[in-house]
């Protein structure tokens, strides 16, 4: 059903369809779960109360601009617990920068138009540095004495550092031959 959109997105952005579909599945169960909280009122509240008022104030005004443009009607603009909305869970400010009108109807609708959402996701990944042909990740075997405090996406190190700590690709390749760019900072996700 979405093959043409995904193939066109791959040609334009270099992001393989499987990755875009994986994001869609993780973020909203393929559009089935897109949020249950009214976006504008929730962002308005968060912009006045709490620890991240400045951040949510920017998101609040971005949501108002989305509604003003008519891309999405207010009755359909709901968000998840984390503040994102639509098929692939964009924050309003991210939507403003990266959403695309794939079908050419004049609206960037990530709530009711899966084609716009999938194309926007590919654009988001490309603009975020996606490199076509590069692996996004691979399974690594770690030594029994590996310190789990070193794991996590915030603890990025060159593959050579992980190799020095005993990491080896499960398929037997050394991390140096894993397809990662030399000096690329990577993270171990457990």
Stretches found by the model and what they are:
Residues 1-180:
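Catalytic glycan-binding domains that act on GlcNAc-containing polysaccharides
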Residues 184-190:
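Short, intrinsically disordered, charge-balanced linker/junction segments flanking boundaries
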């Amino acid at each position: 059903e979405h093959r043409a959109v995904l193939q066109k997105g791959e040609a334009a952005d270099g992001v393989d369809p499987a990755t875009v579909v994986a994001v869609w599945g993780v973020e909203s169960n393929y559009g089935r779960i897109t949020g249950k909280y009214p976006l504008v009122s929730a962002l308005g509240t968060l912009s006045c109360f709490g620890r991240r008022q400045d951040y949510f104030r920017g998101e609040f005004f971005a949501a108002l601009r989305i509604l003003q443009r008519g891309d999405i009607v207010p009755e359909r603009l709901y968000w998840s617990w984390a503040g994102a909305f639509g098929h692939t869970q964009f924050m309003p400010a991210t939507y403003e920068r990266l959403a695309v009108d794939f079908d050419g109807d004049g609206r960037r609708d990530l709530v009711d138009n899966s084609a716009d959402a999938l194309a926007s996701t590919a654009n988001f990944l490309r603009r975020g540095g996606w490199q076509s042909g590069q692996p996004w990740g691979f399974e690594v075997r770690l030594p029994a004495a590996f310190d789990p405090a070193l794991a996590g996406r915030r603890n990025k190190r060159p593959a050579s550092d992980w190799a020095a700590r005993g990491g080896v690709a499960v398929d037997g390749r050394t991390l140096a031959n894993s397809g990662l760019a030399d000096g690329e900072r990577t993270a171990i996700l457990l």
